[in-house]
Amino acid sequence: DYEEYIDAKKNIFKYQNENDIVVLNYDNEITRACAKEAKGKVIFFSDKEKLDNGYIIDEDIIKICTDKIRKHLLNVNDVILRGKHNYENIATALAATSTLVDIDKAIEVIKNFKPVAHRLEFVRELNGVKWYNDSASSSPTRTLAGINAFKEPIVLIAGGYDKNLDYKPIAKPILEKVSTLILMGQTSGKIFDCVKEEMENVIK
């Protein structure tokens, strides 16, 4: 069950000592509470709270804040990766390696790091339009993460094999962020039913 899953994850820091580091998501109530059980140094990251000590994702800027330093580390617009989840991963990586590598070198690596294939993978830019391949996002939850990764207007190609999932959760984000929706495959009808009352630019 979920409690067993949480306990299993705690094994990551269960056998640490005071010289070790554990990086935790401050915005998640469960991971925040894990700090009480950590034996090593706890470093938090957050994209919601202005932490006095930790790594902050503030709009487009990743910052470090400690008792001794407050510094802008990276503008997320300078990296190839897109999406809130990736920016959280970047903050985590910077925190985890903060005592091991030169942070400027780490930032250079991050700026040039390319995502794995089919996961918000940048394909090309043509006539001012940037094309991304996110075909690995085969569930509504992952499609939602992909949609939320962009501030620009989106032309979304969606659909595919029907896994009998609920597509209602992505209706509102599609209506808010997608200018044109192109549907295909077995799930095209289900997705269309979620947006047909309010969306005009749909191609089936």
Residue ranges and their predicted role:
Residues N17, K39, K151, L175-V178, ...:
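Residue-level detector of structured alpha->beta connecting loops
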Residues D1-Y26, I30-K41:
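Phosphate-binding loop of NTP-binding sites
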Residues I170-K204:
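C-terminal helical cap/extension that packs against the catalytic core
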